Amino acid sequence: MRISILGAGAWGTALAIALAERHDVVLWGRSEDAMAQRARSXENTAYLPGHPLPAALKATADFSLALDHVAQGDGLLIAATSVAGLRPLAQQLQGKAIPNLVWLCKGLEEGSGLLPHQVVREVLGTQLPAGVLSGPSFAQEVAQGLPCALVIAAEDAALRELVVAAVHGPAIRVYSSDDVVGVEVGGAVKNILAIATGILDGMSLGLNARAALITRGLAEITRLGIALGARAETFMGLAGVGDLILTCTGDLSRNRKVGLGLAQGKPLETIVTELGHVAEGVRCAAAVRNLAQQLQIEMPITNAVAGILFDGHSPRATVEQLLARHPRDESISAS
């Protein structure tokens, strides 16, 4: 199968490495110099060092080449940008002959508060077969060929089947869903909760506290998702509890590292600079807080993280305030 991946960051590169073993894959990046260097060295030293690019993988900065590669037949076009980069990429695709579009990003667009599928529809319309590939997956492990499971969510059944045929393989299991909203909400909010978990762990508050936070965080994800039209069962799957557990507990999680740094008293700007890569939870926290307020949904953990990130609230005082909240029933509707 012909596959073009637009975006040569860590996740785009990792997926390209995995898929190039079985498919004809083009990996596109914006920088001509960077892509030429990757083609010469057969490695993405900037985002995924130590993982050689397969000889069959074509690395290019030629946008037309990447699109022409999938224009005919059963081609698959994958957007491997951040949420912030999705709209500019979709605008580049306007008027182009593309068969479909699947994105990997997780979050809400800053400013508009839109989910990725809403951004794509706004720019490219509703007729294009489109969907999101998500789930618990660190790029480094995918590049190593370690096992993982993902979910493709799309309204178009043929696109779901195409993505399963393309991505499902010896080390990657792919499940399918038509709940695009649920999969996207799970992928967005779990990043915020990973920051919260990093704060707790950085304050050495113990495993009991971590488990409680993850559990009540899942209730927040579900509450928001249902309000936006998602199905509750989606959050019991890979894009919900699966991605939440990995991002909150895995040492490779950038969002968790943000929380650890905040607990140590580091300024957010310093933490982001040290990471060197995108931590979507930082970008997403304000947007989710605003959306929850508009929908009148209680999301106390999300609000607490946004307060620490943007309002100068103390992590320790914030934790104390969360613990001091009035007891209530344990349910999705309760906060």
UniProtKB/Swiss-Prot annotation:
HAMAP family: NAD_Glyc3P_dehydrog. Sn-glycerol 3-phosphate binds at K106, G135, S137, K190, D243, S253, R254, N255. This is Glycerol-3-phosphate dehydrogenase [NAD(P)+]. PANTHER family: GLYCEROL-3-PHOSPHATE DEHYDROGENASE, GLYCEROL-3-PHOSPHATE DEHYDROGENASE [NAD(+)] 2, CHLOROPLASTIC. The keyword Nucleotide-binding applies. NADPH binds at W11, R30, K106, A139, R254, V278, E280. Its main location: cytoplasm. It catalyses: sn-glycerol 3-phosphate + NAD(+) = dihydroxyacetone phosphate + NADH + H(+); sn-glycerol 3-phosphate + NADP(+) = dihydroxyacetone phosphate + NADPH + H(+). Catalyzes the reduction of the glycolytic intermediate dihydroxyacetone phosphate (DHAP) to sn-glycerol 3-phosphate (G3P), the key precursor for phospholipid synthesis. One of its GO terms (molecular function) is glycerol-3-phosphate dehydrogenase [NAD(P)+] activity. It comes from Paucimonas lemoignei. SUPFAM superfamilies: 6-phosphogluconate dehydrogenase C-terminal domain-like, NAD(P)-binding Rossmann-fold domains. It comes from the Bacteria. Disulfide bonds: none annotated. Its EC number is 1.1.1.94. The active site is at K190. GO terms for biological process: carbohydrate metabolic process; glycerol-3-phosphate biosynthetic process; glycerol-3-phosphate catabolic process; glycerophospholipid metabolic process; phospholipid biosynthetic process. Pfam families: NAD_Gly3P_dh_C (PF07479), NAD_Gly3P_dh_N (PF01210). NCBIfam families: PRK00094.1-2, PRK00094.1-4.
